[in-house]
Amino acid sequence: MNNPFMQNMQQEEDRYLTDVHPLAKLWALRILVELGGAKEFINDNCFSHQWIAKHLGFSEALLGEQFNSQIAYQELAQLHQMAEIVQVQNPAQFSAELSYNLKLLQRLLGLNEVECLILGFVVLVHSEQLLDDIADHLGTLTAAKSMKALAIILAVPYEDVRQALAVQGCLHRSGLIHLQREYSSYL
């Protein structure tokens, strides 16, 4: 039985997610492929979040009645590979507004490029539902694992991320980002 309320909610969600930021999509694919988030995302019989699969670009066959987890993993690998190729050929950037604000903060606080990238990532996690939901597939992470995950997601050296998130770093001192080292948390 079709529930009109659920259909309206799905239509609203589809409308809201029609324009997923290219960086959010790339980073979501890295989480799924390079960090193992796919184990939670691709189940034996379906995707854990059908709407995410749709917006990442999975085929209609997998989104419908013909789901096959093996084919889903193959498509995921292809989607990830294509996103990486596109990123090399035509690098995605933050929106003009976010770029402007990051540049202002960079000048005011003396942030380096990696610190700006981490801050931009945090903004996208909080503003892009797709990226936020995919990041949850990593489960709880210690501070060290969070830094390793960020290095992989952002494709920057681990040591640069560690320095950017250090207690003596600009992000921590400014209060913009505080990585709690005492316990595990979601990314």
Describe the function of each predicted region:
Residues 1-187:
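Intrinsically disordered, low-complexity N-terminal extensions of AAA+/P-loop NTPases
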